[in-house]
Amino acid sequence: VDPAILRAAQRLKAFSRRAFLGGVTASSLLAADMFVTREVQRQRRQTVVLEVADDAARRRFPDASWILFPGYKTSWEEARIILSSLRGSLADRGQLATVGYSNLGLDIDEILDALRVHVRQKRLRTLYFYGHSFGGMVATEVAARLLSQDGVQVKVIVLDSSPASKFDVLDQAWFDSVVHLYEIGVRIPSIVRGGYEFGERVINKHERTWGEIVDQTLEQLSPLAPSSVLIQSESEYIYQWDATRFGDAMGTARMAFIGNPSDTTVSYPSARARWERYFGRNLVSSDLQTIGAFPPHASPQWSGIVYNQVLGRLLPQLLPLPRPTGGAGGGAA
């Protein structure tokens, strides 16, 4: 037998073995990735309350917690990042947790049920709400319903760039089309949503690179991102929300609105005026601004320094810390 043929056969055998092992490895990784993807999607079919671990806050405030209500198209991961960015301010008054909306759609009853379970399991007695963008609407309704249905009084609600009406949202054309499709039962497929996400980021490119635009578009289409159904249901919720239902239903909750005059998503003057008009008896502050935050709409995850400075001025009005008592000789603190 020709030695060259033998060498070629040996090389082919070695290559085939490597190719086989490589194929098995790739298949295993793909199967594992598909399993993880399905598991993530399965878990996100229910509404949950997610904690952000902070042992110091848990020790200091065992029965008090902030609850974040995330904004439009905000994923569970980004909600946790928001809380981590605000930890310096919020953790001085309570533990930290966020609502994770179900990918099957926004459901206030489910949010209430998840919150009741969380309160019972953690033995919480004091609740503070932080409404991120449209999450301020959700926080307001949840607080009103907790009071009327359970007799639970939410102590504080911070409204971060939150619209108080569909008319406060600047992009009315997209808003109306999404809601109309949702109401007639049409769900937006991923390819259409991907085109919109990309176009939206091109229009609002600002200082982002093209690579960042593509990355952010793909993030919105990953298994970790909110589903198209959830986003459509969030849009419908904003569209249907009526502040007059809750203006007299907040009990003794102390509310505050913060925002940015440069906001290109929600009209700052319109939203501020509406919160003042309908929640005047509860609204403690509405003049603090997140100037310098980028992007200007509800961006604590990107502008933590700005937000913590604003909250450093706001929270003493809403939740004054108890003054230490006692002197050098001892005493309670």
Regions found by a protein language model. Give the residues of each.
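Conserved alpha/beta-hydrolase
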Residues: 87-105
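N-terminal export leaders
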Residues: 15-25
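Serine-hydrolase catalytic core
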Residues: 204-286
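Active-site nucleophile loop of the alpha/beta-hydrolase fold
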Residues: 158-169
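Gly/Ala-rich beta-loop-alpha elbow adjacent to hydrolase catalytic centers
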Residues: 131-139
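Short, surface-exposed "cap/lid" segments of acyl-processing enzymes
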Residues: 42-90
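N-terminal secretory signal peptides
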Residues: 1-15
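Catalytic active-site module of serine/aspartate enzymes centered on a nucleophile-bearing elbow/loop
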Residues: 287-333
